[in-house]
Amino acid sequence: MARKSSLPEEVTRYKPCKCARIRNDGGVYRVYKYSAVKLASGEWSSDYGYLIGKIIPGEGFFPNKRYQKELAEQNLKSFPDGITDVAYGKYALLLGITRDLRDKLKACFLPERAAQIYCYALILCVNGFVHIDQVDDFYQESFLSLVYRKYSFKMGYTALSNLLHDLGSRGEPVRMFEQELIDSCSKNVAIDGHVVRSCSLENDLAEPGYKLSLLKAPQVNVLIAYDVKNRIPLMYRTYRGSSVDKKSVEDLLASRSFKDTKFMVDRGFFSDTVLKLMSKDGNCYIIPLTVSNKNVKRIKKTLQCTSGEFVYKTGRKDTARIIYYEEQIDNDVRIIVYKDVDENNSKRKSYQQLMDMGENNYTQENYDKYCDWWGVYFLQTTSKDPAPVVYSDYKGRGSIETYNNYVKNDADFNDLKIQDYYVQHGFDFIMLVTGIIHEKLNEAVKRINKSSVSIFDVLIKAGHMRMVKHEENWQLHNTRTKDLALLEAMGFVPEKTYPL
């Protein structure tokens, strides 16, 4: 006599196959793939196996995505619910202008991992800050999901968390990539520090720092090394929020090999140890001095900028007249004092106007005290270059825009919620790659030589273009002749079709 089922008939009639078993979980009828297993005793039993869907009484069987895929692969049933319209223009543009970056990643990482890193960075560069649990949505709805559909990597939360953890804990490929950037750079390297607010109480690096009163939260400190002439980042490294830059930079410099490099750093990095590190292996440095420096105090007493003068070009048409005083401290170290005459005159005029208007704290006494020192720079250097070159190198450092500074919103790269130590360092590398992509886009925009066109404008215009799925292929939609002409001037011509 057959055993009578305890499940209602309005449920059992929707049983999808013989090898399925239905389980009532508090009124939810889940369906599992049933299989027979032979026990060690020789007797037979059953195994529920994996979940394939659920049954709603009176409605039918609802397969989950795994079972849908299984049925489709067996040509038993098709569930055509895939995305048929993807964002094309922004991603295709960046893919075209960053081919060399993709090749560099492939030289240091396995192909799957290189592609995953590349896609993650592209998504961040195109869309600004995207939380890790939202990246996959952007990926699936982008042209990247077509380009890399034959790859097996995933872009979900777990997959990207594992990626960041591996980048932070298995650092040899990262070291190789960064060292290649350093070896092939212009040898003019700036190092700068950034304070990043950290909202995670479990982050090992997050600590109260010198900006606690401003941030109202712990911070982490990020040091970034840049190639000044090529305007790309070379290294990102996160340090404890309580650490000072002059100590953190010791670790940064020791972690990679720098040879015949000229360092441009700010006064916060001034220490004997750091200066020695920046002077070995044929390296040299340029660093501004603080007003409390003993040599600055001594030189100020009798300063006369009589060593020479030159004209510094500040822009396409703008220039500045610079006079300077130069003094050799020892066999290697010089102090050069520069005075920007035009800047000094401009600030004198501005101050006098504010003083005439009766603004608070703008007094004749303060004017007489400070007017001679406006536009004056005290630089210490071990570079053998002449004074005009040293000044030009130092001023060039100020034109660097980091990707951290480019993104402007409240929940962004300046307000991280990362908890894991390794994930934090893995994200450093993603930010490095994103910063390189950003600068390549910036250079491509500059080449069209239109001051009215910005990166934002280009991404908006390219972002209108879509790839839509048709019966025979994917086809380009939503284009405009004016936008196509602008993008062509950048060297990007969109594909009209893409294979299925």
Model regions and ranges:
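Dynamic "connector" segments at or just before major functional cores
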Residues: 1-190, 194-200, 224-237, 250, ...
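Short, conserved catalytic/metal-binding motifs centered on acidic residues
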Residues: 33, 135, 188-196, 231, ...
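Active-site cores of enzymes that catalyze phosphoryl transfer or operate on phosphate-rich substrates
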Residues: 176-240, 341, 345-374, 378
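Active-site beta-loop-alpha junctions of metal-dependent nucleic acid enzymes
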Residues: 237-258
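Acidic, metal-coordinating catalytic cores used for nucleic-acid/nucleotide bond scission
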Residues: 264-273, 291-294, 423
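Short, solvent-exposed helix-loop connector elements
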Residues: 387-393, 411-424
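Basic, amphipathic alpha-helical segments enriched in Lys/Arg and hydrophobic/aromatic residues
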Residues: 418-442
